[in-house]
């Protein structure tokens, strides 16, 4: 059986990029042995736990936003390809509105439209800003997932539908047993790319008061009050987002090659 050469892409990366490995190793050695001599690096080490907690907040928001957006997007995408116009029209309106709305506007909208507390029975439950940001990011995520889902369905050759109908399969059986398994493989690369974009979009959360990585970096910069530290800490913020999103991008490229002719 032939083996797809693209499957070995992640394993062959170190052999094809020795220069990058040397550069990363040199940078790591500089941080380990040279950083403690500098007060700027010492301050960065002191703030590192707080930065890690803040970045954890960004990751939590991104995971919840893509989860909610994916579930809602699959439902909207299924409605968008429905033969009934009464269900297809609202789904397409949703997709067009939230795909073309600025994310910052949606975040401000959800922040100020939803209350600070929810009254359930005799209890008041806090409705924190980070949850509102999650909803604000889940809305465009759902529209993009719906469009990805619709595009994946449209990429399935029509001959498969015709062959299935000739075997007396119902539309529901064709959809569940034949179309959906192929769709999910085709959806995976763009879905992962969308998640990386959502993760970078969580940087907007600090604008509405969420204590995330950006907000922590701002507090640290104002507290230490050194120009070199300000440059270093925002470079560290950039490095954290890059270190989290770049592997997702590489895996996405690998999956695109893997399923290119599936």
What residue spans do the PLM features occupy?
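Transmembrane alpha-helices and adjacent helix-loop boundaries
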Residues: 1-262
């Amino acid at each position: 059986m032939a083996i797809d050469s693209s499957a070995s892409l992640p394993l062959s990366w170190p052999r094809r990029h020795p220069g990058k490995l040397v550069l990363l190793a040199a940078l790591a050695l500089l941080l380990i042995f040279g950083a403690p001599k500098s007060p700027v690096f010492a301050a960065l080490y002191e703030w590192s736990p707080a930065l890690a907690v803040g970045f954890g907040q960004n990751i939590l928001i991104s995971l919840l936003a893509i989860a909610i957006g994916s579930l809602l997007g699959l439902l909207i995408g299924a409605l968008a390809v429905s033969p009934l116009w009464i269900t297809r029209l609202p789904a397409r309106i949703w997709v067009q509105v939230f795909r073309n709305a600025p994310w910052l506007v949606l975040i401000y909208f959800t922040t100020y439209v939803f209350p600070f507390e929810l009254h359930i029975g005799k209890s008041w439950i806090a409705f924190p800003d980070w949850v509102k940001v999650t909803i604000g990011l889940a809305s465009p995520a759902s529209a993009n997932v719906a469009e990805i889902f619709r595009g994946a369905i449209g990429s399935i050759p029509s001959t498969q539908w015709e062959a299935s109908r000739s075997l007396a399969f119902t539309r529901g059986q064709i959809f569940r047993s034949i179309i959906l398994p192929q769709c999910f493989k085709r959806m995976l690369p763009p879905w992962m790319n969308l998640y990386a974009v959502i993760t970078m979009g969580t940087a907007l959360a600090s604008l509405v008061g969420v204590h995330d990585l950006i907000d922590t970096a701002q507090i640290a910069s104002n507290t230490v009050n050194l120009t070199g530290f300000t440059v270093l800490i925002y470079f560290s913020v950039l490095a954290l987002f890059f270190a989290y999103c770049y592997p997702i991008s590489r895996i996405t490229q690998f999956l695109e090659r893997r399923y290119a002719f599936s």
